[in-house]
Amino acid sequence: PLLETRKIKIEELSGQRIAIDGYNVLYQFLTSIRQADGSLLTDSEGRVTSHLSGIFFRFSKLVENGLQLCIVFDGKPPLLKKNLLEERRQRKLKAQIEWEAAIEAGDTETARTKAQQTTRLESHMITESKHLLDLLGIPWVDAPSEGEAQVASLLNQGMVDYGASQDFDTVLFGASKFVRNLTLSGRRKLPKQQKWVEVSPEIIDLEASFQKLKLNREQLIDVAILMGT
């Protein structure tokens, strides 16, 4: 891997203050917590509950293991992302059509894959998530703009001990101690393969990565731009 990582057990983070990229983890819950045909979990009135299920069960487990969580929600997206957000919207619409076609054809595997590509985070889901976090006693904050940037800012101000996200942008924003796979379950299916891999939390050490790569953060950002991610 490009960056220096170290696999850990959740228990190793006991007592640590961790800022979690809220939008990232909610998308993760909405993508992965689904039924066999790709449909989202719903209550008796048809309201989506996948995001709430993820928050309740997975965050509760982290708290039980002694982690002190703070969830960071995105604010207004930067204007530079306008075209990208429109491209994503169009891809989701295309995936929606392909999902419905796969269901009609009885192809449950393709249906589930396409369904995951339609994932949308609606404003009411954010409101519901914040309410559940309040009930669980887990603090949350709204970022001025990008959640990953706010996570890195909290970390660099010493207000938390680690940042957590699946998005490497958090590292590019300067998160020096970064955790991935914090809220993922133990196994994950590889895309388009009948193969499962074990997933465990891992820490990315930014300073060790810089030493290994002989780069600084500005140069790493340049590499990310050249790679298109």
Residue ranges and their predicted role:
Residues P1-K92:
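Non-catalytic, usually N-terminal nucleic-acid engagement modules in DNA/RNA processing proteins
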Residues T42, N83-T229:
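Extended two-metal-dependent nuclease catalytic cores across DNA- and RNA-processing enzymes
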